[in-house]
Amino acid sequence: QGCCNGPKGCSSKWCRDHARCC
């Protein structure tokens, strides 16, 4: 679970906005 497991991976804007997920 977390942004790095999301469809866009850690480079996506969503992930950067939720950096604690990484």
Swiss-Prot record:
Compartment list: Secreted
Q: List the disulfide bonds.
A: C3-C15, C4-C21, C10-C22
Q: Tell me, in one coarse class, where this protein mainly resides.
A: secreted
> Quick check: keyword Ion transport in the entry?
no
- Could you tell me the superkingdom of the organism this chain comes from? Eukaryota
Q: Name one GO molecular function term.
A: toxin activity
User: Which keywords are on file for this protein?
Assistant: Acetylcholine receptor inhibiting toxin, Amidation, Disulfide bond, Ion channel impairing toxin, Neurotoxin, Postsynaptic neurotoxin, Pyrrolidone carboxylic acid, Secreted, Toxin, Voltage-gated sodium channel impairing toxin
Q: Where are the transmembrane segments?
A: none
Instruction: Extract one GO cellular component term from the record.
Output: extracellular region
Industrial or biotech use: Is commercialized under the name XEP-018 by Activen in the cosmetic area. When applied as a cream, it is claimed to reduce fine-line wrinkles.
User: Could you tell me which residues carry Cysteine amide?
Assistant: C22
Tissue-wise expression: Expressed by the venom duct.
Q: Any idea which residues bear Pyrrolidone carboxylic acid here?
A: Q1
On whether Secreted is a keyword of this UniProt record, the answer is yes
Q: Give the free-text miscellaneous remark of the entry.
A: Negative results: 1 uM does not block cardiac mNav1.5/SCN5A and DRG-specific rNav1.8/SCN10A channels. 5 uM does not block voltage-gated potassium channels rKv1.1/KCNA1, rKv1.2/KCNA2, hKv1.3/KCNA3, rKv1.4/KCNA4, rKv1.5/KCNA5, rKv1.6/KCNA6, Shaker, hERG1/KCNH2. Found in both injectable (milked) (IV) and dissected venom (DV).
Describe its function. Mu-conotoxins block voltage-gated sodium channels (Nav). This synthetic toxin blocks both voltage-gated sodium channels and nicotinic acetylcholine receptor (nAChR). Inhibits the skeletal muscle rNav1.4/SCN4A (IC(50)=1.3 nM) and the brain rNav1.2/SCN2A in a long-lasting manner. A low inhibition is also observed on neuronal mNav1.6/SCN8A and mNav1.7/SCN9A. Modestly blocks nAChR alpha-3/beta-2 subtype (IC(50)=450 nM) (partially reversible) and, to a lesser extent, alpha-7 and alpha-4/beta-2 subtypes (reversible).
Similarity comment: Belongs to the conotoxin M superfamily.
Instruction: Please state what the annotation says regarding this protein's domains.
Output: The cysteine framework is III (CC-C-C-CC).
Name this polypeptide is given: Mu-conotoxin CnIIIC
Q: Which organism is it from?
A: Conus consors
